Design a protein with these regions (language model features):
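Short acidic, Gly/Ser-rich segments with clustered Asp/Glu that frequently serve as metal-coordination loops
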Residues: 18-22
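Active-site-adjacent betaalpha module
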Residues: 1-10, 43-44, 56-182
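Active-site gating/metal-coordination segments in enzymes
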Residues: 9-17
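A short alpha/beta connector and helix-capping loop motif
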Residues: 6-9, 25-49
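Short, solvent-exposed loop/turn segments at secondary-structure boundaries
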Residues: 23-27, 138-140
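Short beta-strand segments at enzyme active-site cores
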Residues: 13-14, 48-53
């Protein structure tokens, strides 16, 4: 496995939208962990890409997350379940020249699963923040995570991913990230 760094990785947050999130099993935890990921990505200067599945019908990214998105963060509308079905997403990702993709968002068994499988097929090193993803039914989420693992995806907690990005307590942002996870 290739360790994620701010130089080689990007966070891909999938479809954390106004009409989707409330339908999830444990939406509050998923929301809080995605806020943590965005906050940490901001501190670490990690590239972020955000998608919205058919925003006309499902709404935009929830305000609690949208406030963390900077001007440089593309929010990409899509209709394909996989982010790789969006030419705009592919173009934005290509500009960033990243090798490692860290995924979070919803729904685990639909858009997230198809995006992750496409990323693996395209040769990316893929990490999924297992506690920052969800489906309406826990069983769907569990099955999707198992499928991802079987394809060589690293399925880790948000906290594990953040400390992998730091690699060392001597990292200049170690104290800041440590405070965020407590």
């Amino acid at each position: 496995m290739k360790f994620p760094t701010v130089e080689n990785a990007a966070l891909v947050m999938i479809d954390m939208q106004q009409k989707l999130l409330p339908a999830m099993n444990d939406p509050q935890t998923v929301l809080e962990l995605n806020i943590l990921l965005l906050n940490a990505a901001d501190v670490l200067k990690l590239d972020i890409l955000v998608t919205e599945q058919y925003p006309k019908g499902l709404g935009n990214t929830v305000p609690e997350l949208a406030t963390w998105l900077g001007e440089k963060t593309p929010v990409i509308a899509k209709t394909s379940f996989s982010v790789f079905g969006s030419a705009e997403f592919c173009a934005e990702l290509a500009k960033r020249k990243r090798e490692v993709l860290i995924f979070s968002g919803i729904e685990s068994h639909v858009c997230l699963l198809q995006s992750v499988l496409d990323a693996v097929e395209r040769g990316y090193e893929v990490i999924v923040a297992s506690d920052a993803v969800m489906s309406r039914k826990f069983s769907d989420c569990h099955a999707a995570l198992e499928m991802m693992r079987s394809k060589g995806v690293s399925v880790l907690s948000t906290e594990s991913i953040l400390f992998m990005l730091l690699r060392d307590a001597a990292h200049p942002e170690f104290k800041t990230i440590s405070k965020l996870v407590k």
